[in-house]
Amino acid sequence: MSKETLKANLREIPDFPIPGILFYDVTTLFKNPECLQEILDTLYEMYKDKGITKVVGIESRGFIMGGALAARLGAGFVMARKPGKLPAEVVEETYAKEYGTDTIQIHKDAIDENDVVLLHDDLLATGGTMAATHRLVQRCGAKKIFINFIIELGGLNGRKAFPEDITVDTLLTL
């Protein structure tokens, strides 16, 4: 999928969720069947030969392509969620945000030392949530970890949140 096609199908909403913020709404990419298929096909081609055994999707828009990609890759799908959303025993990572802290959790038995894991979310801004998820999956003993986003907000330097030896892929940088 061309970057121009992605950008043309991405909705921009000014002053959301607060004044002064330009929100990039990826739901317009998901409601367009051609875009949805192209994104899935592109992600599949990027990771089909990496030996991925688990895809971790970050709540909540990371669930959409993460689940579809896991099925296409023949991998398991793991949900990374905010506290109180997962029913079994969890492991968690707390991380700093601009105003306070937040926590991300996965089931304790979701990842093990034999897993090659792809972490997926829709958009890379500051990288805080994904960096916490990366640390969490590392603690679970994953053999190898890849990170992917559909969109990257380049001006926010979110890649700095990750160790230099981690591959971070995006389909479109704005």
From Swiss-Prot:
Localisation: Cytoplasm
First and last residue of the signal peptide: none
Reactions mediated catalytically: AMP + diphosphate = 5-phospho-alpha-D-ribose 1-diphosphate + adenine
Matching Pfam families: Pribosyltran
The keyword Cytoplasm belongs to this UniProt entry's keyword annotation: yes
Cellular component annotations (GO), alphabetically ordered: cytoplasm
GO MF annotations, alphabetized: adenine phosphoribosyltransferase activity
EC number, UniProt record: 2.4.2.7
Entry keyword Transferase: yes
GO biological process, one term: AMP salvage
Cited InterPro entries: Ade_phspho_trans (IPR005764), Adenine_PRTase (IPR050120), PRibTrfase_dom (IPR000836), PRTase-like (IPR029057)
Key words of the record: Cytoplasm, Glycosyltransferase, Purine salvage, Transferase
Enzyme class: transferase
Pathway involvement of the protein, from the record: Purine metabolism; AMP biosynthesis via salvage pathway; AMP from adenine: step 1/1
Function: Catalyzes a salvage reaction resulting in the formation of AMP, that is energically less costly than de novo synthesis.
Subunit structure and binding partners: Homodimer.
NCBIfam families registered for this protein in UniProt: apt (TIGR01090), PRK02304.1-3 (NF002634), PRK02304.1-5 (NF002636)
HAMAP family: Aden_phosphoribosyltr
Family designation: Belongs to the purine/pyrimidine phosphoribosyltransferase family.
Name of the molecule in the record: Adenine phosphoribosyltransferase
